[in-house]
Structure formats: C-alpha cells, structure tokens
Regions:
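Non-heme Fe(II)/2-oxoglutarate
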Residues: 1-78
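Karyopherin-beta/Importin-beta family HEAT-repeat alpha-solenoid scaffold
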Residues: 2-6, 159, 171
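Active-site region of the double-stranded beta-helix
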Residues: 53-84, 92-106, 111-117
Length: 178
C-alpha cells in the first residue's frame, strides 16, 4: 500500500528563556490599570492589542520575530514577517477563550508567561470541514495524529506555539487557583 499525506497543518513550538516573573508582574500591573477588551475571553482579562509597542515587552517581541522568521522560512514564504496585534490574556479559575480564528493574519501564536497543567490547554480543531461529516467508530487505543479531530496542547511557561491564523482554536477553562 502507498500512503502519502496531503494538506497537513503545521503547528510550531519553541521554548525560550525570558524573565517570566517580570513579564507576569508587568501584565498584572497592566490589568490593574486597564479594563481590557471583550473578545473571545470568558471570565478573564484580555488586554488591548498594542502590547508590542510597550518597551517592557520588547524582549518577547524580539523572540517572537526570530521564531516568525524561522516559520516563514519553513513555510516557503517569500516575505519578511510583520507583527500585527499582540495582547495578553489572564485567565483566572474558570476563565477560558472561546473558539476563534485570526483574520487578516498569516500566523498566530501563544506565549505562556505563567501556567500549570490545570491552567487550560490550547485546543486546536481539525480545519477540514468535510472530515466532520462522518465520524466512524475507531478501534480502542489512541489513533495516529492524522485521524485526530482536535489536539490539546499543554501550556508550559516559556513556550511559544505558532500556527496558521485560519486554524480554529480555543483555550479550555482554567481549573487551577493560579
């Protein structure tokens, strides 16, 4: 039998070293001074989208741009990346983000400043609408990735995750007290 894969969806990850304690403190201070905005966030705080322009976040912006360049190279894109909107989310216990995409962007990403295993995983959804038409019964056990309909990515402090902006994703409710 010959098997080939077509139309894969690449999700990229990279672990970086930044002063996450300082980043977290800056974000908490920002949230205390700014009511934020309501987008996909549920029971949580979503900052305005001008985070990249604030000097205290430039070390993170620099790391994001390095990764963006690597992703663009991997994806055969013949252009330089431009960082558009950037914001912070704080999801307290019960906080989450509803399923959404990011229009007018090529890639989107997440950076985890602070997290733990119960803090709410990033869930990405199979982008193929036709794949949802029939959901056959499967054998017992964990099927191979090409048969998954959703993938749950665990949050780790210091991790960047980048994915196509058209990929539907959400954040599960934070079950921790942190």
């Amino acid at each position: 039998m010959i098997r080939e894969e077509f139309f894969p969806t690449n999700v990229y990850g990279k672990d970086i070293k930044l002063n996450n304690h300082e980043l977290a403190q800056n974000i908490f201070n920002w949230s205390a001074q700014d009511p934020g905005v309501n987008n996909t966030n549920v029971k949580s705080w979503h900052s305005t989208t001008d985070m990249a322009s604030k000097p205290e976040y430039h070390p993170l912006v620099d790391e994001l741009m390095i990764m963006c360049k690597d992703v663009f190279k991997e994806e055969w894109l013949d252009r330089e990346p431009v960082l558009g909107n950037m914001w912070a989310n704080i999801n307290p216990k019960g906080g989450s983000n509803q399923p959404h995409i990011h229009p007018n962007s090529l890639f989107s990403g997440v950076y985890y400043v602070k997290s733990n295993p119960q803090a709410g995983r990033l869930r990405i959804h199979d982008p193929r609408p036709g794949a949802q038409i029939v959901m056959p019964n499967r054998r017992k056990g964990k099927p191979p990735k090409h048969l998954w309909r959703d993938a749950n990515l665990d949050p780790f402090p210091g991790r960047i995750i980048m994915f196509p902006a058209w990929l539907w994703h959400c954040v599960e409710p934070n079950q921790s007290n942190d």
